């Protein structure tokens, strides 16, 4: 989801999202 920094763009597709642990 947009603004979601907890999941990688593989799931939310949001630019700037960090890779999940």
Curated annotation (Swiss-Prot):
Residues crossing the lipid bilayer are none
Q: Signal peptide span per the entry? A: none
Keywords (A to Z) from UniProt: Glycosidase, Hydrolase
Which GO terms of the molecular function aspect are on file?
glucan endo-1,3-beta-D-glucosidase activity
**Reaction catalysed by this chain?**
Hydrolysis of (1->3)-beta-D-glucosidic linkages in (1->3)-beta-D-glucans
Annotated spans, Disordered? 1-21
| Enzyme Commission number, as recorded | 3.2.1.39
Listed name of the protein? Glucan endo-1,3-beta-glucosidase 2
Identify the species of origin.
Answer: Papiliotrema laurentii (Cryptococcus laurentii)
- Lineage of producing organism: Eukaryota, Fungi, Dikarya, Basidiomycota, Agaricomycotina
């Amino acid at each position: 989801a947009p603004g979601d920094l907890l999941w990688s763009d593989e799931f939310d597709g949001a630019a700037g999202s960090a890779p999940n642990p």
